[in-house]
Amino acid sequence: MELQRRAFLRAGASGLGTIALKSLLRADDSAAVAPHFAPKAKHIIFLHMLGGPSQVDLLDPKPALARFEGKPMPDSILKGKQFAFVPKDAGALASPYKFAQFGESGTWFSELMPHLAERADDLTVVRSMQTDEFNHGAGELFIHTGFGRLGRPTFGSWVSYGLGSLSDSLPTFVVMASGPNASGKSAWGSGFLPGVHQGVKFRSGEEPVHYLANPEGVNRDRQRQVIDGVSALNRLARERYEDPEIATRIAQYEMAFRLQASGPELMQVESEPQHVLDAYGAKPGDGSYASMCLLARRMVERGVRFVQIMLRGWDHHTGIYRPNALPRSCRLMDRPTSALIDDLKQRGLLDETLVIWTGEFGRTPMVQAISPQGFTQDPGRDHHKDGFSLILAGGGTRPGLTYGVTDDFGFEPAENPVHVHDLHATALYLLGMDHTKLTFRHQGRDFRLTDVHGRVVKDLLA
């Protein structure tokens, strides 16, 4: 008993604060395996438009839809396809919005994205995206984990596992959201990877996580002693039980302590010059998408590897063209996203930061009419997995490129299809990782983000 007490006191006296988190994790075989080759990017900012933006209203103009307005799609296109709600004989629905070409690249944007359109020569637009899932929960899981069911690690968790942290005082993987999402915490979970690699959910107010401030009467020195004592007990338990999740618990206590110092400074967006706040449209503490985008830049500056922002409001089954539907979603998104790209570029961070703007899928070129009057009075669009668009910026991608072509209706790729697995493989490549070698042994087999699929789309690279 006395021997155990002495061991505990020695462990507590040493203090976890003197031990690098990276060393702790490496001892548990859950730390970074280092890049496989020279990376072009160090960070990813993943902007997830929850619900699925309509590609034919934003990025992929289809004049043929006007010629076929109200007429069913050809059987040759619809055969074997899956939809969430819309019947297969639904008529084509043309976009009411004007499209134009922008920049030297001549990239097409609709009038709903005027700010992003002005940055056309800094952006890569992929029009030929495909996914396997057409419902929100499974679709969210697929875009984040490469698998449509629960239990797999998310993209950010794989990046954390593969590359480790760039900061000793902030998490490697941070998540911010405008509201609940269909797949819940599984959209940033670590799955079967060690729990230390899961995303940390931040709020965009003054206190990013609950209970960040010490209770009244507890100063930082006292808190350090408590953390060291608890960590010493956990380390003894780790030696006895050899449970890797105990290392996660130790690391989380230590990160929480360090966040007490780094978190408040990170969240003080009011310290930004007024012209920066104005560019984003951000107001300190308002919890808006604009503030999240500004915080994403501040996080990247301070070494956060993977920032995931989730913006609700893109699931328009009916009333898609109401002022408070697609137009409103674009107004909330367009200016802050553009400001983020400008800000990263001006600070020399865009070259090392890959920005991904996407939904979990797109919307059908056909109308979803809830009522007989729906087609003419209040049309919507259903979920669509077979062809949608996304935007990339920075991180070694080719600016000014429009990649992939869909058919005349915007239904599915006619040239250069890009699957979600290909997106993951390409993003990992830009981070210096070979997606076929980034593996984790679980239940007798090696798993990876891209499963047994995926290819690096070299045409997207600068």
Predicted regions: what they are:
Residues 1-462:
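Ligand-binding pockets and gating/stacking loops
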